[in-house]
Amino acid sequence: MHKTTIGLLCLAATYQASAQTESAGNQSLENRLSQLEQQLASMEAKDASDDKWVTLGGRLQIDANIFDGAYNADNEGNTGSTIFPRRARLSVEGERSDLEYKMILEFAEETIEILLLRFEYTGFENGPTIKFGKIREDITLDALTSSKHMALIERASMANTMSPYFRWGVAAYQYFPSTGLRYAVGVHKNDAFGAEGTDDDSAISLATTGRLTWAHEFKENNLIHLGSWGSYRKMDNSQLSASFARAEVREPNVRLVNYAAGGDTVPLDHLNQYGIEAAYQYNSLLVQGEVARRNIATSDPASLLDDENYDGYYFQASYMLTGESKSYSKGSARFNQPKGVEDAWEIAARVSSMDATSEFQGTRAKSFTAGVSYYIDENTKIMLNGVHSKVSGPGTEALVGDETSGNAITMRFHYDF
């Protein structure tokens, strides 16, 4: 269609030129050619814009785990194993003018879930970006790091305890290049941590979340990141889920961080969560850590668990053996894998703890993880981790019996397309 249009315009220009004097004809021809160039540029720009409207992609992760001890306490701590699809996703995304969108479908063996359905409006000059739909809440640096970019196979127990990940809502965020500050604030439907998502009158239970970060780049691949976040979440008499985290091994028979072990779950009026985060990058080395607390307000103020606090932390270091450096996303305030990484090796280690104990119930898990990853290219990665966890607290015997420690070897094949 474009070629036909250009051909007709060329014929028209030639006809006009032959009907006039030579000088006038040359001038007319130049004008026509200029118009043709402008029209062609407009067509190409339109085609490029249309191409951005739909982009298809996906993520496949296959995991295999071997575990014993506390992770398999239901089977007397004997060695267990499993292989499963950790993530199987299809995505579609695009943009037109000031509006961007992305949708991710998560495939399980018997279900398909809309994991993310995000629209972003970027049309406010020198103003915030507005996003709405089913979006990721801005809670903890570790939880905000995409599974594509993680140095270890699973996130820290603290991050999995505190983050609700993707929830329906609306949020605004903005980065200020002159100061390195970034803020994010959002209001979301709270159907996480056992909350049903509505109160007794069928009104939506809401969560308000905010995160403030600061980053300073000393030179290329040398920067510091500091941040804090907080979240207030209405529970509206819903029972707080007993299990907080698995202790960094997916699909074990026992989830080791459990506030109700040896006791009971409790209905909540609301809960508060807040934390601080820090990271430092020096070329191929990245160190980061976070500390966070969950405070609960029970529906019955006379409950023994009213105003109970649950604390967690982790410290992690990773190093690219082949010299690459992680990239830092200023707009999202998080780290990504090295750009264009290929035929590269990375090692990482982490110590973490999540304490879900109270005076009479609950468990605490402390985990040590070490791992190595091989990047075939920027879309393909093989990972191997070793994990050792210790369980303690008044609910330990009820949860794991005499199996107070557990070991695991975890493996992953990752492919993006």
What is each stretch, according to the model?
Residues 24, 39, 46-49, 65, ...:
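Intrinsically disordered, low-complexity regions of eukaryotic proteins
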Residues 27-30, 80, 202-203, 308:
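Soluble non-cytosolic domains of exported or imported proteins
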Residues 1-43:
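Cleavable N-terminal export/targeting peptides
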Residues 22-23, 77, 240-417:
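Outer-membrane beta-barrel pore domains
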Residues 45-46, 266:
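Generic recognition of long tandem-repeat/solenoid scaffolds
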Residues 14-15, 99, 397, 401:
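Hydrophobic alpha-helical membrane context
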Residues 47-72, 77-236, 314, 319-339, ...:
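Outer membrane beta-barrel
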